[in-house]
A protein has these predicted regions:
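Short helix-loop-beta-strand segments that form the rim/entrance of peptidase-like active sites
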Residues: 97-119
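Histidine-centered active-site/metal-ligand motif
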Residues: 23, 106-107, 168-169
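A non-catalytic alpha/beta surface segment that caps or lines the substrate-entry region
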Residues: 1-15, 21-25
Length: 198
């Protein structure tokens, strides 16, 4: 339901049941729905000019230095490339192909492809866990080659309404409540490394 696709590769050995989860959607930033990629073969630190006027360089994107000499896909600037999470989906499908083609031993492997990750994990919330009875699950997302992320941030939303108490300056002692100072105090209580900008 809700566009969630689940599948199972039946195990051929006594191993834990694992799950791989990928999201199907890409970030919607009001660009073209049609992907317009640019393939740069044998990337040699050249400047990439996008149709929207932006330029991609190793100065603005130092992570590109790790990919010198490789073929790289970029967006032309008129669309989102969508590597998050299409790259992970292709990796999962390739991993399943390799396991099957080489008759590798494995326990049950469950797959879940969910929609609407970028807009509040709606697909993940709709995942029927009775169809995903795993011992361990891994979210496969867009990372650097060889990189494993073993923790993630969680975002939440809250609306805080602070009402102050106004008072005439002469009679404000122990009566006036400045809502800006109350808000500042609340913000100061948030752990520094868990704020959205981190």
């Amino acid at each position: 339901s809700y566009g969630v696709l689940t599948a199972r590769l039946k195990g051929n050995g006594d191993y834990p049941k694992i799950g791989w989860i990928c999201h199907l959607d890409t970030a919607d930033i009001s660009l073209s729905e049609v992907v317009h990629p640019i393939l740069v073969e044998n990337y040699l630190e050249e400047e990439i000019k996008q149709k929207n006027g932006k330029r991609i360089t190793t100065e603005t994107n130092p992570e590109l230095k790790k990919h010198i000499g490789k073929d790289i896909l970029f967006s032309d600037g008129t669309s989102v490339l969508g590597a998050d999470d299409k790259a992970a989906i292709s990796i999962v499908m390739e991993a399943i192909s390799i396991i099957m083609e080489n008759s590798l031993e494995h326990g049950d492997i469950y797959l879940a492809f969910t929609p609407d990750e970028e807009v509040g994990l709606k697909g993940a919330k709709a995942l029927d866990l009775s169809l995903f009875p795993v011992d361990w699950a891994y979210t496969i997302d867009c990372q650097e080659k060889g990189e494993v992320v073993w923790e993630t941030f969680n975002a939440g939303k809250a609306t805080v309404r602070i009402e102050g108490v106004s008072a005439h300056p002469m009679s404000s002692k122990e009566v006036l409540i400045n809502p800006i100072l109350v808000a500042t105090e609340i913000i100061s209580l948030l752990p520094e490394k868990q704020r959205p900008e981190e």
